Amino acid sequence: MAGVAGGGGNGNDFQWCFSQVQGAVDEDVAEADIISTVEFNYSGDLLATGDKGGRVVIFQREQENKSRPHSRGEYNVYSTFQSHEPEFDYLKSLEIEEKINKIRWLPQQNAAHFLLSTNDKTIKLWKISERDKRAEGYNLKDEDGRLRDPFKITALRVPILKPMDLMVEASPRRIFANAHTYHINSISVNSDHETYLSADDLRINLWHLEITDRSFNIVDIKPANMEELTEVITAAEFHPHHCNVFVYSSSKGTIRLCDMRSSALCDRHSKFFEEPEDPSSRSFFSEIISSISDVKFSHSGRYMMTRDYLSVKVWDLNMENRPVETYQVHEYLRSKLCSLYENDCIFDKFECCWNGSDGAIMTGSYNNFFRMFDRNTRRDITLEASRESSKPRAILKPRKVCTGGKRKKDEINVDSLDFNKKILHTAWHPMENIIAVAATNNLYIFQDKIN
């Protein structure tokens, strides 16, 4: 199989090829440099990453020109800023990590760009803007900014704007704090572009982008007695078109769809999505691997996708009793769950994403492998984010994992997989076949090569 047909929706088969890689080649990677979130903006011209050191790096797409015809999927650093700093909660004697958990872009309204970034406790709204002119010729200041003696000023000057080198500024416009007792795992901007939600383990809050000192609690699953706690919220997202509808997933593998029109506190769901468990396959690990790590609405709003430890499921919003599609991501790991439990990998939170036309989906795996599934043809492919195939326009070879004793030449044995190399965060350009894949401290960008 050559590839998974994607973004353009034209159904042509194509191959994925290497575009670029950002990040250091070091063997010893500093914890702070590990990428923790990746997100394209609405146009796909900007790509933001957050890391465990609290930094946000924004990449801007290069304009394709005649001298460089293959720069279509090339992104270069546009702005870097420190979004969050480590803090200490003295009341609870807890360290608050600076790690960026999520980044969400706001739709562009003017020349500036806005994004939300969050760590475990605090959400910030950032404005990213450009300056290429500066004012000169002030009356009370000289060109170096020093104050002039008013008694020596003999003529009145009108300040003028002079061109300067382009400068990109990132400034915090709002800080939304003190609303979450537990760790924030999700933020999602509403389709009304005025409100957004933030979710932690037990509660979901609704915020207005202009108001920082109060939020509305719309879901609260905290029991009166914490010993009765049986599940936690793992992810939440607003519907892309209906501003009153949102979903949240749980550690029990269920998804609840809520309608804010029915009541202010959405503790009663409108729809409850759950797949009945097969009793014959129940094991000690069943509950752990059924925990949902990510939920994403399709662009059309008709479907939603959930990721658990071993699979990706696509649900039709009109059918609650089972998913319409199930894709096995790395079924060969089912026999390895015991060792994955011992090394804590079983608790890894893999994300998933749709392509622009909702015809294909992508999610990560171990050994720096990532998987793509074509929903129309039901074909799938395993690719690897590796510097070994990082020549410009180098075509990615499909990878295969074997579980038996005999291994073919181009296959890798399941026992040889490196579980320290994992692709948790991926993003797909909203309109084209350009993908971003975070592998530890490196950001890989791949694009299609149509056959």
Swiss-Prot record:
<dbReference type="InterPro" id="IPR018067">
    <property type="entry name" value="PP2A_PR55_CS"/>
</dbReference>
<feature type="repeat" description="WD 4">
    <location>
        <begin position="228"/>
        <end position="268"/>
    </location>
</feature>
<dbReference type="GO" id="GO:0005829">
    <property type="term" value="C:cytosol"/>
</dbReference>
<keyword id="KW-0131">Cell cycle</keyword>
<dbReference type="GO" id="GO:0000278">
    <property type="term" value="P:mitotic cell cycle"/>
</dbReference>
<keyword id="KW-0963">Cytoplasm</keyword>
<dbReference type="GO" id="GO:0019888">
    <property type="term" value="F:protein phosphatase regulator activity"/>
</dbReference>
<dbReference type="InterPro" id="IPR000009">
    <property type="entry name" value="PP2A_PR55"/>
</dbReference>
<protein>
    <recommendedName>
        <fullName>Serine/threonine-protein phosphatase 2A 55 kDa regulatory subunit B delta isoform</fullName>
    </recommendedName>
</protein>
<dbReference type="InterPro" id="IPR001680">
    <property type="entry name" value="WD40_rpt"/>
</dbReference>
<keyword id="KW-0132">Cell division</keyword>
<dbReference type="InterPro" id="IPR015943">
    <property type="entry name" value="WD40/YVTN_repeat-like_dom_sf"/>
</dbReference>
<feature type="repeat" description="WD 5">
    <location>
        <begin position="287"/>
        <end position="325"/>
    </location>
</feature>
<dbReference type="InterPro" id="IPR036322">
    <property type="entry name" value="WD40_repeat_dom_sf"/>
</dbReference>
<comment type="function">
    <text>Substrate-recognition subunit of protein phosphatase 2A (PP2A) that plays a key role in cell cycle by controlling mitosis entry and exit. The activity of PP2A complexes containing PPP2R2D (PR55-delta) fluctuate during the cell cycle: the activity is high in interphase and low in mitosis.</text>
</comment>
<keyword id="KW-0677">Repeat</keyword>
<dbReference type="GO" id="GO:0140767">
    <property type="term" value="F:enzyme-substrate adaptor activity"/>
</dbReference>
<feature type="repeat" description="WD 6">
    <location>
        <begin position="342"/>
        <end position="383"/>
    </location>
</feature>
<feature type="repeat" description="WD 3">
    <location>
        <begin position="179"/>
        <end position="217"/>
    </location>
</feature>
<dbReference type="GO" id="GO:0051301">
    <property type="term" value="P:cell division"/>
</dbReference>
<comment type="similarity">
    <text>Belongs to the phosphatase 2A regulatory subunit B family.</text>
</comment>
<feature type="repeat" description="WD 1">
    <location>
        <begin position="30"/>
        <end position="69"/>
    </location>
</feature>
<keyword id="KW-0498">Mitosis</keyword>
<feature type="repeat" description="WD 7">
    <location>
        <begin position="418"/>
        <end position="451"/>
    </location>
</feature>
<feature type="repeat" description="WD 2">
    <location>
        <begin position="95"/>
        <end position="136"/>
    </location>
</feature>
<keyword id="KW-0853">WD repeat</keyword>
<dbReference type="GO" id="GO:0000159">
    <property type="term" value="C:protein phosphatase type 2A complex"/>
</dbReference>
<dbReference type="GO" id="GO:0010458">
    <property type="term" value="P:exit from mitosis"/>
</dbReference>
<comment type="subunit">
    <text>PP2A consists of a common heterodimeric core enzyme, composed of a 36 kDa catalytic subunit (subunit C) and a 65 kDa constant regulatory subunit (PR65 or subunit A), that associates with a variety of regulatory subunits.</text>
</comment>
<dbReference type="GO" id="GO:0051983">
    <property type="term" value="P:regulation of chromosome segregation"/>
</dbReference>
